[in-house]
Amino acid sequence: MLGDEKEGTSTIPGLNQIQFEGFYRFIDQGLIEELSKFPKIEDIDHEIEFQLFVETYQLVEPLIKERDAVYESLTYSSELYVSAGLIWKTSRNMQEQRIFIGNIPLMNSLGTSIVNGIYRIVINQILQSPGIYYQSELDHNGISVYTGTIISDWGGRLELEIDKKARIWARVSRKQKISILVLSSAMGLNLREILENVCYPEIFLSFLTDKEKKKIGSKENAILEFYQQFSCVGGDPIFSESLCKELQKKFFHQRCELGRIGRRNINWRLNLNIPQNNIFLLPRDILAAADHLIGMKFGMGTLDDMNHLKNKRIRSVADLLQDQLGLALARLENVVKGTISGAIRHKLIPTPQNLVTSTPLTTTYESFFGLHPLSQVLDRTNPLTQIVHGRKLSYLGPGGLTGRTANFRIRDIHPSHYGRICPIDTSEGINVGLIGSLSIHARIGDWGSLESPFYELFEKSKKARIRMLFLSPSQDEYYMIAAGNSLALNRGIQEEQAVPARYRQEFLTIAWEEVHLRSIFPFQYFSIGASLIPFIEHNDANRALMSSNMQRQAVPLSRSEKCIVGTGLERQVALDSGVPAIAEHEGKILYTDTEKIVFSGNGDTLSIPLIMYQRSNKNTCMHQKPQVRRGKCIKKGQILADGAATVGGELALGKNILVAYMPWEGYNFEDAVLISECLVYGDIYTSFHIRKYEIQTHVTTQGPERITKEIPHLEGRLLRNLDKNGIVMLGSWVETGDILVGKLTPQVAKESSYAPEDRLLRAILGIQVSTSKETCLKLPIGGRGRVIDVRWVQKKGGSSYNPEIIRVYISQKREIKVGDKVAGRHGNKGIISKILPRQDMPYLQDGRPVDMVFNPLGVPSRMNVGQIFECSLGLAGSLLDRHYRIAPFDERYEQEASRKLVFSELYEASKQTANPWVFEPEYPGKSRIFDGRTGDPFEQPVIIGKPYILKLIHQVDDKIHGRSSGHYALVTQQPLRGRSKQGGQRVGEMEVWALEGFGVAHILQEMLTYKSDHIRARQEVLGTTIIGGTIPKPEDAPESFRLLVRELRSLALELNHFLVSEKNFQINRKEV
């Protein structure tokens, strides 16, 4: 339990802090820990000894900048140097050299790493903490069976169980179990020592038979018995040193290494005082665990809740990087051993530099960042996405759970999550509850536990002195923690006598005098995504979950706008995301343009480069716009340039637009949305998207591929944008099918395709005549746009393994269109169904047409009423020119606080603007509006307002797809599935029933034969389409029916059909 030095106020911590602290811990502690484990290596004759001197390790500053690493597809890493010594024992000479061990990828200012030019982030994993856990299950007779499970640091398990005769067994595998006496003897204790170290010796003696006595008569016998049971070996194995080594390796190292966390947990659970540096399971632990199990059987002690956070640990960036370093050093050890023996065999004199290679460390880290499930490509759709990605917690990954095996209890919210893991923010689908998000104030403690801050209240005066404490999940159970009214931000408020509080995972109402701690902030138990939802307390949790996920999918718009109604966290999120450019110290602006800002400060002149039209990995456009003028003085921390989706240093993901909640001719049925053409022509929801197209040139067996403009057999129109080298020119407008890079691949022509003169040359002179095949980079369907960047990456040594890469970046401007997805911040999502002319849209009493029409039936059943509060308050804010920042759970101040706030602001707006329709007492919040087509008022008053609406990345341009011809699956001969493979649309059972219901026999036959898997029929269709004529009908069965027949044959079932003649009833058998 840690106290914060500053008493009283608390600020929101840096939201990237978790990643930075983890990496710092790895560099500061993990590196030295792993390097100091590196053993001294000797040759076979024990003449030469190699060792590392850990104290002098050095990490060199990276040779390239972050921006260059991204641009040139390199890794932003630091070189690791260590001093190494080679000692000749006979002459007692030592040669010491500084050696290069390998590259370690560094963390940048965003909390991410750049590997091969790609931003990657390592997410934190939640694992079962090593230690011992007691549980009980009912057997088939309804009797409780108690077990104790010892979990090692590597996740290996050893189970102790007690049967109805009070005998204790250790289960070493699912089928095999051995007596605890045998296990203790194999670990080195004799019977007398066992009985001296247990609380219930008479129970241990009760199941000691003569056969058992023989087994534990000596340590060797016990080890043999244990080996037989563990390895399921028959016969009579003989005791040997190799047998002991195998047991050590397979059992004791895998299942008995507790680590420092496991040792601490076992000491605490079993009341032991074994030193912390003793990280292996000892016989004393086993006996204490058995004693505890016997106590459980007789009703003493408490069972463990496996899902409580005190029984979990966080495996952070530091632990994962340290594990990889250990793996790399183990490989390096093998390399050094091999090199020493090779040098001695060839009678060479080794030096430390010759023995060590940098390959193991560099390749281990590159493969970790590229292949490990917890290392992911940073999602950079918008600033919020970047920052939330680094704060994820996953139960999945190596040593964790899988989406299929995790049960409901693991996925559910637990009381210990309060203030540590957000109860709202998780993924939807198969991983629901397995991927969570850290709460805003949570941090990772030294023992891998999640800690949450609280204010400590002192006895004499519950208000005078207040100190902040960080509690782990095991500590906060002992305190009464106040919630509800005591959360008031103004501490001067007179607290009520009885307050709601939390104690030992129960929610109670207690007197204020009994409270020990109180929460520090209303947002304390939410993640960043959930904290950005205003009026979240009025929403159903499922809709809040959808909203926190959908805000991460919002596309940065060409002209961003701050939200009128927010929560106050927008500025912090934007700052910590690293998207805006910020002044590192005070100074004066000397020069600004779109590419850089130059300012002087502390006697230096600094130039800050700005990001211009950079592509994110979700194809959104990242761009910085300067916000300071030349000659202005700036302070430290001031914003110099806004990034994508930020305005004035605040997060701005969408637009405040005028919305009406009413049905309109069925065009907003079932979550469809009707919009005005103003949103299209006014570029309100226009976004820029940058796509990357790349092509490689290889050296083939026939010769190198060539980049050229001279490509035969292609129309000049397709080559119009190429320069003299055959690469598309910057700034040119390209359409679908245009050539971006002209490339020819050499190939040897077939004998039959030679011209007569070529054959003569070949026969007389033996000259091989080669031709070329056109393999140009063409712009695919839907890729039209402006070429904004071309990069030709030429790697050293143009071999076939090191190809040249040409990348072309094309920018697209996308207006909002029918089929795009929009959403509010309350889980209210919908698809654009129709774009109406502005004169046909419903209009207000002051003549303004609304921009968007939502369906009111989407609100009551989904219980996301927060959108109505936001909608009305947004209207008041736009009329009064105010912005609101609202903390959640404002009902703690008084009842109906949200409604009172909204109505009072609407009333004031109505008075100030002299518009009585803004607040009408008969139906507050609603207004009479008019049909744009007829000018008549609608029958009922309608809710109108200005909510904040986002455009999501699910856009129709990326989804729309049609297939005329394409590839077929080899087995079923049916079209492939999916847009990326040029696949077809599936006609399933239900679609066939629907077509049958309408009686469209010919369409149905087409669907099931020509367009699907009738091979001969579809070839005939192609022929008749080219030469004309009628399409012949398919006669025999399609390929999928033949496949069914073949599968039945594999089960020895023959399927045939018979023709029975009407005249003589003769049967003609026909094979299918």
Swiss-Prot record:
NCBIfam families: PRK00405.1 (NF001616)
Keywords: Chloroplast, DNA-directed RNA polymerase, Nucleotidyltransferase, Plastid, Transcription, Transferase
Family: Belongs to the RNA polymerase beta chain family.
Pfam families from the UniProt entry: RNA_pol_Rpb2_2, RNA_pol_Rpb2_3, RNA_pol_Rpb2_6, RNA_pol_Rpb2_7
SUPFAM superfamilies reported in the protein's UniProt record: beta and beta-prime subunits of DNA dependent RNA-polymerase
Reactions mediated catalytically: RNA(n) + a ribonucleoside 5'-triphosphate = RNA(n+1) + diphosphate
Cellular compartments per GO CC: chloroplast; DNA-directed RNA polymerase complex; mitochondrion
Domain of life: Eukaryota
Protein name: DNA-directed RNA polymerase subunit beta
Location(s) in or outside the cell: Plastid, Chloroplast
GO molecular function: DNA binding; DNA-directed RNA polymerase activity; ribonucleoside binding
GO annotation (BP), single: DNA-templated transcription
InterPro entries: DNA-dir_RNA_pol_bsu_ext_1_sf, DNA-dir_RNA_pol_su2, DNA-dir_RNAP_su2_dom, DNA-dir_RNAP_su2_hyb_sf, RNA_pol_bsu_bac, RNA_pol_bsu_CS, RNA_pol_Rpb2_2, RNA_pol_Rpb2_2_sf
Function: DNA-dependent RNA polymerase catalyzes the transcription of DNA into RNA using the four ribonucleoside triphosphates as substrates.
